[in-house]
């Protein structure tokens, strides 16, 4: 399945523990979507259009009124990407 680069970046961030939080207007309509990483940074690639596309494909879902997280379908459709994080492993 073809997904755009911003969608890929957003899914990778979600797979690493990020969440998507929504901003609504007075009428309850979604006006903005923000992807917050596990470290608290905001991902610039995540826009309202990216959010709607990922939700339409059911790659993300909200549970119990909480922030949106990656689903099993979203994780399956991720392409392999080198992780930039450096981990210290003893041994």
Swiss-Prot record:
InterPro entries: YjhX_toxin (IPR018654). Transmembrane segments: none annotated. This is UPF0386 protein Caul_4643. Pfam families: YjhX_toxin. It comes from the Bacteria. Belongs to the UPF0386 family.
